Amino acid sequence: MEASSLVAERPTGGEQDPGHARCAFYLPRKRRSCGMAPKAGARFCAEHQPGDSGTAARVPCPLDPRHTVAKAQLRSHLARCNRTKQDQALRAEREHMPWYEAGVNSAARPAAAAADEATLQAAVMRAIPVLAQIAEAEFRAPLRVAVLSNAQVEHVRFPQLPSNRKHALQQSSLIQHLREAGLWVAPERPVAYVEFGCGRGELSRYINQAAVLEQLERGGPAAPPAFVLVDRACPRMKFDSKFAEDVAELHARFCPSVPPDERPAPAVTRKKIDIRDLRLAALLSPGLEHIAVSKHLCGVATDLTLRCLAAGPRASLCGALIAMCCRHACNPAEYANPAYVEALLARHAPDMSYDLFFLALMKMASWAVSGRRPGVPDTEVGGHFSGLAIAERERLGHLARRLVDEGRRQYFADLGYDAELLVYCERDTSREDIALLVRRPA
């Protein structure tokens, strides 16, 4: 959208200080004006200059379409674009990154052929009775519901959130599951938590808080765990620096007798890397046990993580706790356990292909989390291509999610681990309420 079409949305107000001029373009989403400086005599910066202003035409940058560049200067811009510099720096770093190997966690299976909407809908209609039959034969027992709460998270985190505690409730339950499953740090048992798809590192931060506070409540001093944070993005407002600050603050509040120079800070390592390319063994400290964690690891990223863990140093892998989400964003070719689905099809629908059935599962899985408008009854069909009422679509969506998740659970069970699917939070807290808990057998 051109700048001229949005200028009218800018709230009226006083004139800008000529000595501190800023671009007059108003950013509705950020509720403020653009912070860039325009050229002398201009109201807008180059990025937001209206297209009819007589200035040179601008086009999206091919490297990063979030910004534009004068068309006449495109060639020179590509050589100095920040994205080019970032890519060059990343390539240079990779030459000295033993934990990077392109595609090391990708599956060898060829990619599934793309299906148009008509083909996909036909596959869904064919898969519905197959899914119902599989569920009746294989998944009759419901998942264990274990909505837990961690006292340390409630003590530190909850007072900071007077209203919306949905994320904190999920973190509290996941952290308590780690504790009760024996996937917990202690002064005599140092561990490293590896958070996949970490984002800002929020889950790891509160694991750190809970572990340190628990040790201090027992008389301290605390021995915080180590953390390895993995994400392919580089989000703003990361929590990395907060880990040490939290340890210092908790010591000051609950164990002030420990001198500041004797308060150990956690080792926090962040790597910007796609899980697909991660060689985990090269990131871990020798002799240190590790535990994988993640909250709402999206779609195919869960399958890449499972293969990453299986290919890593299993002798030091104590276990994993992964809250999964977005089965509709999976990939038949990258799914961790296609043999599991193929075996089910061989028993219940030998004439249906794995690829089409999995694509149908992905489509149906979205029905469980799409939600309803207020007041929509269970019997509402709403012109849906399946002809099924919304309550039945939701039920089938949960069955599709269960099948995808059961294959992941079986993947680790086949490696000799104790693996369990469980409901870790209330549905009104999050519709993505299933976690995979993996433990090394005793």
Curated annotation (Swiss-Prot):
GO terms for molecular function: tRNA 2'-O-methyltransferase activity; tRNA methyltransferase activity; zinc ion binding. It comes from the Eukaryota. One of its GO terms (biological process) is tRNA nucleoside ribose methylation. Zn(2+) binds at residues 61, 67, 77, 81. Its main location: cytoplasm. It catalyses: cytidine(4) in tRNA(Pro) + S-adenosyl-L-methionine = 2'-O-methylcytidine(4) in tRNA(Pro) + S-adenosyl-L-homocysteine + H(+); cytidine(4) in tRNA(Gly)(GCC) + S-adenosyl-L-methionine = 2'-O-methylcytidine(4) in tRNA(Gly)(GCC) + S-adenosyl-L-homocysteine + H(+); adenosine(4) in tRNA(His) + S-adenosyl-L-methionine = 2'-O-methyladenosine(4) in tRNA(His) + S-adenosyl-L-homocysteine + H(+). Residues 1-21 are annotated as: Disordered. It is an enzyme of class 2 (transferase). Pfam families: TRM13 (PF05206), zf-TRM13_CCCH (PF11722), zf-U11-48K (PF05253). Keywords: Cytoplasm, Metal-binding, Methyltransferase, Nucleus, S-adenosyl-L-methionine, Transferase, tRNA processing, Zinc, Zinc-finger. The keyword Manganese does not apply. A zinc finger (CHHC U11-48K-type) spans 58-85. GO terms for cellular component: cytoplasm; nucleolus. It is found in: Cytoplasm; Nucleus, Nucleolus. Belongs to the methyltransferase TRM13 family. tRNA methylase which 2'-O-methylates cytidine(4) in tRNA(Pro) and tRNA(Gly)(GCC), and adenosine(4) in tRNA(His). This is tRNA:m(4)X modification enzyme TRM13. The gene is TRM13.
